[in-house]
């Protein structure tokens, strides 16, 4: 408040492990000229931060989650813990609309979109070509540093939109990305980003099948989920089932997930009919069937029978365990009165926890989660993000 009253320019530094609600402070203070999110860099974080602030290093990180304007903008904001009055059970009702998929599909404007991140320089991103090779799409993208002072790196992101049908899908999905090397002012780099056909598929829970529906799939190019331009349209001529799977974890009770309203569906349909799409190049894309569960099993047994036998032995041991013995797999190895940061790890001191050792006698070891010591080794590159 003091700096705002004195009209002093301020750089807001966030040393937090997740999104922070900033809308109110940004609306009330007009002297915040920049925000630097350093995300808990570790003991050398101060040196890395100083290099960025002094211009010795150029930030090139991107947000790996959407930052909402208000906490209430998240779809399950009132569902967790005591907020809905049920302390015994948590239901995750987002379904396919997780993160940016929810904000895009339901028309919620975020404070900072998924994939967002600024630099001290600027870039031009241009699609130079697209080639379909068997079961993948090969895109060629040119990135040019259009600034005149700082070298920098940029992250190219490719998203796909889907044909609007009775089968519910999110509006768009990240299907590929790549980061450039350090580009000097005026320098250009060509990136090749390959998109596997399964990344364009949707999962049918009723038939347990990965499918691609007939229709137009738009490929959008940019540097965050809200700054995109259509680069190509893929025309899929027929409905295709790419992969048939077996159900292994069926729902034990009905789960009511959120769904698009008819009004929102119509808005998404109209958006894909805009005149500007008429100028976008179109390509015919014919996906191919990948495999069935029986084919996968036959391949494994044919190529590595011993592995299959070991796998069956492990499964048989796990099947003998009671539900009470398996429940710790859900919450990991924790102890009362022990901090979850820095002292919760058993195998690696300094780690922030680990999974359960409930299956160690079956040959399945516990896994160490986020380790603070690993942050120290990567503190310099952590400001780069992706």
Give names to the regions the model predicted:
Residues 166-205:
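Intrinsically disordered, low-complexity Pro/Gly/Ser/Thr-rich segments with frequent PxxP/GP/PP motifs
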Residues 150-158, 170, 203-206:
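Short, hydrophobic/aromatic beta-strand segments
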Residues 301-347, 353-355:
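N-terminal amphipathic, basic-rich helices that act as targeting or association modules
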Residues 5-10, 30-33:
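A short helix->loop->beta-strand "cap" motif at the edges of active sites that frequently abuts
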Residues 227-232:
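Extracellular and select intracellular beta-sandwich modules with Ser/Thr-enriched
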Residues 194-225:
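Short, surface-exposed ligand- or partner-binding patches at beta-edge/loop junctions that are enriched
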Residues 15-153, 159, 214, 218-222, ...:
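Secreted, periplasmic, or luminal enzymes acting at the cell surface/secretory milieu
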């Amino acid at each position: 408040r003091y700096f705002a009253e004195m009209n002093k320019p301020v750089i807001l530094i966030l040393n937090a492990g997740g999104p922070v609600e900033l809308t109110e402070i940004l609306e009330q203070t007009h002297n915040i000229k920049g925000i630097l999110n350093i995300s808990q860099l570790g003991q050398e974080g101060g040196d890395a931060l100083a290099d960025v602030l002094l211009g010795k290093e150029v930030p090139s990180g991107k947000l790996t989650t959407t930052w909402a304007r208000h906490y209430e903008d998240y779809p399950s904001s009132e569902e967790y813990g005591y907020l809905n009055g049920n302390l015994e059970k948590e239901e995750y009702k987002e379904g396919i609309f997780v993160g940016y998929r929810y904000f895009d599909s339901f028309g919620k404007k975020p404070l900072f979109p998924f994939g967002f991140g600024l630099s001290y320089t600027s870039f031009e991103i241009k699609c130079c070509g697209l080639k379909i090779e068997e079961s993948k799409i090969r895109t060629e993208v040119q990135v040019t540093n259009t600034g005149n002072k700082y070298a920098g790196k940029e992250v190219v992101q490719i998203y796909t939109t889907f044909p609007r049908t009775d089968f519910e899908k999110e509006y768009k999905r990240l299907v590929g990305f790549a980061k450039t090397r350090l580009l000097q002012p005026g320098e250009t780099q060509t990136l090749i980003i390959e998109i596997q056909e399964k990344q364009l598929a949707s999962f049918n829970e009723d038939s347990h099948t990965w499918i691609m529906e007939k229709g137009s799939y738009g490929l959008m190019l940019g540097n965050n989920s809200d700054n995109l331009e259509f680069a190509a349209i893929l025309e899929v001529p027929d409905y295709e089932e790419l992969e048939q799977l077996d159900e292994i974890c069926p729902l034990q009770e009905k789960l009511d997930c959120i769904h698009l309203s008819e009004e929102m569906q119509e808005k998404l349909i109209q958006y894909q009919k805009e005149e500007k799409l008429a100028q976008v190049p179109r390509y015919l894309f014919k996906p191919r069937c990948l495999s069935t569960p029986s084919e996968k099993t036959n391949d494994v047994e044919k190529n590595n029978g011993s592995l299959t036998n070991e796998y069956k032995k492990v499964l048989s041991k796990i099947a003998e365990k009671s539900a009470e013995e398996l429940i710790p797999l859900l919450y990991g190895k924790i102890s009362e009165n022990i901090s979850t940061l820095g002292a919760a790890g058993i195998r690696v001191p300094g780690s922030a926890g680990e999974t359960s050792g409930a299956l160690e006698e079956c040959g399945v070891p516990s896994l160490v989660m986020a380790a603070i010591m690993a942050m120290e080794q990567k503190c310099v590159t952590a400001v780069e993000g992706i």
